[in-house]
């Protein structure tokens, strides 16, 4: 949600205020959150800044909880990601995962992603941006990035998206099967 709000801010900086955000947020559809226009680095940087705003954070928290507890009709559940999902938004979630990868792997992945968008960016710029973001995310006062004790740590450094998905699915399936017995 923060990326789409950042997109709105960068597109209409003069209109950007809490009333504007409330109006825009009501119109967001799930498919909007996967739009490629939300992937550029400048959107991520702005999203990080916006997510420190307590009033916007309350709006987004409420929406995330709504999607988690009352997913759209055609869905029987939900999967949310974010720095504070496991301890603030959904502390009672059935399954919690904390995905990580080493810095160079994350930088390579992000660099490839940005290159696909035809962004003129250097690998070292991406690497430094991620270093800064990590520093900011772990040390921030409002909703820092942290792993909860009950979250399962998955290092994705050597995993493809598909292999990561399968690993998570297997953990969930095994747990559900165990609980049925």
Model segments located where?
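Conserved phosphate-donor/acceptor-positioning beta-strand/loop module used by diverse small-molecule
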Residues: 91-112, 120-132
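ATP-dependent small-molecule kinase phosphotransfer cores
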Residues: 2-78, 84, 104, 108, ...
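Basic phosphate/pyrophosphate-binding loop/patch that engages nucleotide-derived ligands
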Residues: 14, 113, 117
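C-terminal alpha-helix
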Residues: 167-178
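SF2 helicase motor core recognition
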Residues: 85-91
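Phosphate-binding beta-loop-alpha motif at adenosine-nucleotide cofactor sites
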Residues: 94, 147-162
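Short aromatic/hydrophobic contact patches that present stacked aromatics
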Residues: 49, 98, 152-153
